[in-house]
Curated annotation (Swiss-Prot):
Residues 135-180 are annotated as: Disordered. InterPro entries: Borealin_C (IPR046466), Borealin_N (IPR018851), Cell_div_borealin (IPR018867). PANTHER family: AUSTRALIN, ISOFORM A-RELATED (PTHR16040), BOREALIN (PTHR16040:SF6). This is Borealin. It comes from the Eukaryota. The keyword Transmembrane does not apply. It comes from Xenopus tropicalis (Western clawed frog). Residues 135-152 have a biased composition (Basic residues). The gene is cdca8.
Length: 279
């Protein structure tokens, strides 16, 4: 008998290789499809933006009459050309109206007023109106005109110069009243000399060495001298905080600001140096 052929396991191996290749191809295909779809979506968005911009440009090119027109009226007039013709006619009519308005001169109503006045004069006078007029005239005549105005007007008419004919004393209301000299006191004949060195000091200055300093409160009242030891700590906003030796332990630290803390630290270091010198 002829020898039988040996069975080989090549078929399943080939199938596994084919499946792997197919799977890798499908993965590549899916990735490329995703990339292409994303590009298409982006291009669609860009095209829509371009269409909107072109649409807006075309609308801007149209005249204002068509832009303000309702779309139903636009379609009823038969589209773009007929609507343009209608808008052009409206524009021409408006230009004619404005030109006629600008050319026509303004009419004055003076003649009408004169005619009305003449007609009123021809009418019979009303007794009530005559009584009212006489009353008003009497009231006006009762007022006495001021003398100052008359004198000024007469001087202006007589002489056109700026010089005054009558010299009057420039008396203020307070000076016009008669005040006794005893109330005002004695005025010296010669003016006293003032020491100019007083005005050379600035508004704020630091006290000199061994100079007696008198303290004042925020209300402006002077504070009495104290035998107890105290320290003035400068704080923010130009304020000074007085610290007594007996009240240092019970002081609320939250009330102090950063500048006060720094000044206290600086003072403590300087006091330590001073105490070392005393020893």
């Amino acid at each position: 008998m002829a020898p039988t052929k040996k069975k080989t396991s090549r078929k399943p191996k080939n199938r596994c290789v084919k499946n792997e290749k197919l799977a890798s191809f499908i993965k590549d295909f899916d990735s490329q499809v995703k990339i292409i779809t994303e590009e298409l979506k982006a291009s669609v968005v860009n095209i829509l933006k371009e269409v909107d911009s072109q649409y807006n440009i075309e609308i801007i090119k149209l005249p204002m009459a068509i832009r303000e027109m309702c779309w139903l009226d636009y379609i009823a007039k038969g589209g773009s050309q007929k609507a343009l013709e209608a808008a052009a006619t409206v524009k021409v009519d408006m230009e004619e109206i404005t030109s006629t308005v600008t050319k026509t001169p303004f009419k004055l109503d003076k003649k009408v007023k004169k005619g009305k006045c003449k007609s009123d004069e021809t009418l019979e006078p009303n007794p009530l109106q005559s009584v009212i007029r006489t009353k008003t005239k009497a009231k006006v005549a009762a007022k006495k005109p001021s003398t100052a105005r008359k004198t000024r007007a007469s001087t202006a008419n007589l002489t056109n110069t700026s010089k005054r004919t009558s010299k009057r004393g420039r008396a203020t209301p307070s000076a016009s009243k008669q005040i006794e000299t005893s109330l005002l006191g004695y005025t010296p004949a010669a003016t006293p000399r003032i020491d100019t060195s007083i005005f050379k000091t600035p508004a704020l200055r630091t006290p000199c060495l061994q100079e007696p300093v008198y303290t004042f409160s925020a209300n402006g009242s002077p504070l009495a001298g104290m035998d107890e030891l105290f320290i003035n700590v400068p704080a923010g906003d130009g304020k000074n905080i007085r610290l007594l030796a007996s009240e240092v332990d019970s002081l609320d630290i939250n009330r102090l600001d950063n500048q006060a803390f720094e000044n206290i630290k600086l003072l403590s270091s300087q006091l330590q140096r001073f105490c070392k010198k005393l020893k």
